[in-house]
Swiss-Prot record:
Assigned keywords, A-Z: Glycoprotein, Glycosyltransferase, Golgi apparatus, Lipid metabolism, Membrane, Signal-anchor, Transferase, Transmembrane, Transmembrane helix
EC number, UniProt record: 2.4.1.-
Reaction(s) this enzyme catalyzes, per UniProt: a globoside Gb4Cer (d18:1(4E)) + UDP-alpha-D-galactose = a globoside GalGb4Cer (d18:1(4E)) + UDP + H(+)
Lumenal side: 29-298
InterPro entries according to UniProt: Glyco_trans_31
Group of enzyme by EC: transferase
Cytoplasmic side: 1-7
Descriptive protein name: Beta-1,3-galactosyltransferase 5
A cellular component term, taken from the record's GO annotations: Golgi membrane
Amino acid sequence: MAFPKMRLMYICLLVLGALCLYFSMYSLNPFKEQSFVYKKDVNFLKLPDTDCRQTPPFLVLLVTSSHKQLAERMAIRQTWGKERTVKGKQLKTFFLLGTTSSAAETKEVDQESRRHGDIIQKDFLDVYYNLTLKTMMGIEWVHRFCPQAAFVMKTDSDMFINVDYLTELLLKKNRTTRFFTGFLKLNEFPIRQPFSKWFVSKSEYPWDRYPPFCSGTGYVFSGDVASQVYNVSESVPYIKLEDVFVGLCLERLNIRLEELHSQPTFFPGGLRFSVCRFRRIVACHFIKPRTLLDYWQA
């Protein structure tokens, strides 16, 4: 009699564990059937200490970051994000953050913002599924406060960006309007598996194919595109995948994606680190702060 009871108890525990796993994973995807809208009337909590009108930058780099990524931000400030002049062109870097429920992290970011003057922030929860809000916040900032920028790059905190090579290629391209480049994704489909990080429901996006877009790990566009995307954004169906949302805006604007170079220069899947190799690329994903510092000290 003891054995059947033990087996029944074991089965019950397995079922209970499976149910707990299911509901915990479901709760990690808060956007499954929720509708979020980018609110243009939300005020900025933090603005960077800069004046684009006096010294219009050639390239503005907008880096999505989180409160826990202080080490990444510090490494970027010491390497590719350091304000400087490349080939006579001024480059400026700013970090995009939302808010956190942690009072300690909020205080740390407040101090960091006062110290470095390079943080842009609005009042939305800083989670992965709010990347569209975060990206549009950066684009809005360019539209409102830095429309004089010749080019803008949106990228992430775990990226290597070769700003010298990027500047060189942009100067050779000689394009100043309606320009958008990056790692082109021209034939992508929505992922309908509920447990995927990139799950998109039919109610959020009913179509079977995405428009052309560039990987959100790093894309570059002419300054005028920031205002055009910002102005059209409220008339475009909202989607939590920020790179797809920007692609939808570009489709509405009839702006075509372009290759920056005849050879691959954007690597969203990462590359094995090599100083020589990295001198001829623009962007590489999955780069740790130590690797950035090693490259700049080489």
